[in-house]
């Protein structure tokens, strides 16, 4: 019997497989495909048992969305805030607002309300022979002016009364 055309009849055992490939052969052939990632667990809202066996609600966590990029330039303005300075009866170290240098203030004592009140009180007690002027010699009874030693600007005043 002759076979028509260029084909010839196969001789010997049949080349077609008689059974499908085994599972191991199939997995080995398809091993170059990546496996899909495991699904991530979502936020839990149920009760979770704590270490003491009691149920407790876990806190919910939410992520903030990523900021949208903006091509506009951002301008930054620096603001310097100078706190109010409390003047006392002793020199203070500060930056002079007039000459902008770090200084230690110079003190000047002037008669204030407490000085005059002390003088009047001593007059009422009978210290008329010049003793009533003693408060004008005591620095602890007078107001204090703070001056800059560089530019002689008045920085502030401490009033005793």
UniProtKB/Swiss-Prot annotation:
One of its GO terms (cellular component) is cytoplasmic side of late endosome membrane. Zn(2+) binds at residues 96, 99, 148, 151. Its main location: cytoplasm. InterPro entries: LITAF, LITAF_fam. GO terms for molecular function: DNA-binding transcription activator activity, RNA polymerase II-specific; identical protein binding; RNA polymerase II cis-regulatory region sequence-specific DNA binding; WW domain binding; zinc ion binding. It is found in: Cytoplasm; Nucleus; Lysosome membrane; Early endosome membrane. Residues 76-160 form the LITAF domain. Induction: Up-regulated by bacterial lipopolysaccharide (LPS) (at protein level). By bacterial lipopolysaccharide (LPS) and by p53/TP53. In monocytes by the Bacillus Calmette-Guerin (BCG). A motif (PPxY motif) lies at residues 20-23. The keyword Zinc applies. Coiled coil: none annotated. Phosphorylated on tyrosine residues in response to EGF. Keywords: Cell membrane, Charcot-Marie-Tooth disease, Cytoplasm, Disease variant, DNA-binding, Endosome, Golgi apparatus, Lysosome, Membrane, Metal-binding, Neurodegeneration, Neuropathy, Nucleus, Phosphoprotein, Transcription, Transcription regulation, Zinc. Residues 1-22 are annotated as: Disordered. It is a peripheral membrane protein. Plays a role in endosomal protein trafficking and in targeting proteins for lysosomal degradation. Plays a role in targeting endocytosed EGFR and ERGG3 for lysosomal degradation, and thereby helps down-regulate downstream signaling cascades. Helps recruit the ESCRT complex components TSG101, HGS and STAM to cytoplasmic membranes. Probably plays a role in regulating protein degradation via its interaction with NEDD4. May also contribute to the regulation of gene expression in the nucleus. The PPxY motif mediates interaction with WWOX and NEDD4. Monomer. Interacts with NEDD4. Interacts (via PSAP motif) with TSG101, a component of the ESCRT-I complex (endosomal sorting complex required for transport I). Interacts with WWOX. Interacts with STAM, a component of the ESCRT-0 complex; the interaction is direct. Identified in a complex with STAM and HGS; within this complex, interacts directly with STAM, but not with HGS. Interacts with STAT6. This is Lipopolysaccharide-induced tumor necrosis factor-alpha factor. It comes from Homo sapiens. The gene is LITAF.
């Amino acid at each position: 019997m002759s076979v028509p055309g260029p084909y010839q009849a196969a001789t010997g055992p049949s080349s077609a497989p008689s059974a499908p490939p085994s599972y191991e052969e199939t997995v080995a052939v398809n091993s170059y495909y990546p496996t899909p990632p495991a699904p991530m667990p979502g936020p839990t809202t149920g009760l979770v048992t704590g270490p003491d066996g009691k149920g407790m609600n876990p806190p919910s966590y939410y992520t903030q969305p990523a900021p949208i990029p903006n091509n506009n330039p951002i301008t930054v303005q620096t603001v310097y805030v100078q706190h109010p300075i409390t003047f006392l009866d002793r020199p203070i170290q500060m930056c002079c607002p007039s000459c902008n240098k770090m200084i230690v203030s110079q003190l000047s004592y002037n008669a204030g309300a407490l000085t005059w009140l002390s003088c009047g009180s001593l007059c009422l007690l009978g210290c008329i022979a010049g003793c009533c002027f003693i408060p004008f010699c005591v620095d602890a009874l007078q107001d204090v002016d703070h001056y800059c030693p560089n530019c002689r600007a008045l920085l502030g005043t401490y009033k005793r009364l």
